[in-house]
């Protein structure tokens, strides 16, 4: 997607310059078409994507740490770090969403400028680039949703291992589901508590409870991003279809123009050929007329009579 967006930007600038030249304007006037400020805003969004990547890497690293944690205080510390990162991800995502909506509004406003109407090169450039930005944003948010699913799945696996380690038995799915949902692990560990004493199992109970709270809170925060994801998905699908229609119309227009050019070329060649044969016919006719006149007049007989 990085390559797609960069390619779109480079293609857009090149196309803009060519449009300026064809319309009799110099490259320096490209800012008048609204592309200069447009590209600056796209680059600003790109910088925010880099921040999202950093926070995603931090969250993935922290999640890996939780797999080896067996003490509640350590789990709580990691949870707090992850919550700060997720809060920052939410803030950045809302900022990006606002900037993308701003691009959409400005794209519509820019169509009122001369030479920037709907379907023009400038308009297609802005539309294609904006869609690329949206697709990238959707992909970024999708990565956080994948992380949420991984956390949820691996949380279950960790709980199953903890139960087996303490009790020596594998709990059924219903018991694990209940523990995951409520965080109350005493019931599942009742036999172990009676046999080993509450004191020896308290650390495990506290760690499971802390892990439960961490997963619940992180999942809620990450689910808040789901609405942003859905909003972007709807916009990308709708505008993607619109862009396809524009490109199809442009492609069709190009085909018609090319076909017209071919027909014109054939007509010119045919006209030249017709002129050539007409000249030959006229020349032959002149020769026939000259021969006929000479045959009638017979100038050589007049010379003999004299």
UniProtKB/Swiss-Prot annotation:
Q: Which GO terms describe its biological process?
A: exocytosis; intracellular protein transport; vesicle docking; vesicle fusion
Span of the secretion signal?
none
Q: Which residues lie on this side of the membrane: Vesicular?
A: 298-306
Q: What membrane topology does the UniProt entry give?
A: Single-pass type IV membrane protein
Q: Where is the composition biased (Basic and acidic residues)?
A: 11-23
Gene3D superfamilies for the chain:
1.20.5.110, 1.20.58.70
Principal subcellular localization: membrane
Q: Does the keyword Transmembrane apply?
A: yes
Transmembrane region(s): 277-297
The organism sits in which domain of life? Eukaryota
Q: Name one GO cellular component term.
A: endomembrane system
User: Has UniProt tagged this entry with the keyword NAD?
Assistant: no
What Pfam families does this protein's entry cite? SNARE (PF05739), Syntaxin (PF00804)
Q: Which residues form a coiled coil?
A: 35-72, 134-162
| Location in the cell | Membrane
Q: Where is the t-SNARE coiled-coil homology domain?
A: 205-267
Q: Which family does it belong to?
A: Belongs to the syntaxin family.
Query: What does the subunit comment say?
Result: Part of the t-SNARE complex.
For this protein, the record's PANTHER family field holds:
SYNTAXIN (PTHR19957), SYNTAXIN-131-RELATED (PTHR19957:SF319)
What does it do?
Vesicle trafficking protein that functions in the secretory pathway.
Q: What is this protein called?
A: Putative syntaxin-131
Which gene underlies this protein? SYP131
């Amino acid at each position: 997607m990085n390559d797609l967006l960069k390619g779109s930007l480079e293609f857009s600038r090149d196309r803009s310059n060519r449009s300026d030249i064809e319309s009799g304007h110099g490259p320096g006037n490209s800012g008048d078409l609204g592309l200069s400020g447009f590209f600056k805003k796209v680059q600003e969004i790109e910088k925010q994507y880099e921040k999202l990547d950093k926070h995603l890497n931090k969250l993935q690293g922290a999640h890996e740490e939780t797999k080896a944690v067996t003490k509640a205080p350590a789990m709580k510390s990691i949870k707090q770090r992850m919550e700060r990162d997720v809060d920052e991800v939410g803030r950045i995502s809302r900022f990006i969403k606002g900037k993308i909506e701003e691009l959409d509004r400005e794209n519509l406003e820019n169509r009122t400028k001369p030479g920037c109407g709907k379907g023009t090169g400038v308009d297609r450039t802005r539309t294609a680039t904006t869609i690329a930005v949206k697709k990238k944003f959707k992909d970024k948010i999708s990565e956080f949703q994948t992380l949420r699913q991984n956390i949820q799945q691996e949380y279950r696996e960790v709980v199953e291992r903890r139960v087996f380690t303490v009790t020596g038995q594998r709990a059924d799915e219903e018991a694990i589901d209940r523990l995951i949902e409520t965080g109350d692990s005493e019931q599942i560990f009742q036999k172990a508590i009676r046999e080993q004493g509450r004191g020896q199992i308290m650390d495990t109970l506290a760690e499971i409870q802390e892990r439960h709270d961490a997963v619940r809170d992180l999942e809620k925060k990450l689910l808040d991003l789901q609405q942003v994801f859905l909003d972007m998905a709807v916009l990308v699908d709708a505008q993607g279809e619109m862009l396809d229609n524009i490109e199809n119309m442009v492609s069709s227009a190009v085909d018609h123009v090319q076909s017209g050019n071919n027909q014109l070329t054939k007509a010119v060649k045919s006209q030249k050929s017709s002129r050539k044969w007409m000249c030959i016919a006229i020349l032959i006719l002149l020769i026939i007329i000259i021969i006929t006149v000479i045959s009638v007049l017979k100038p050589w007989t007049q010379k003999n009579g004299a």
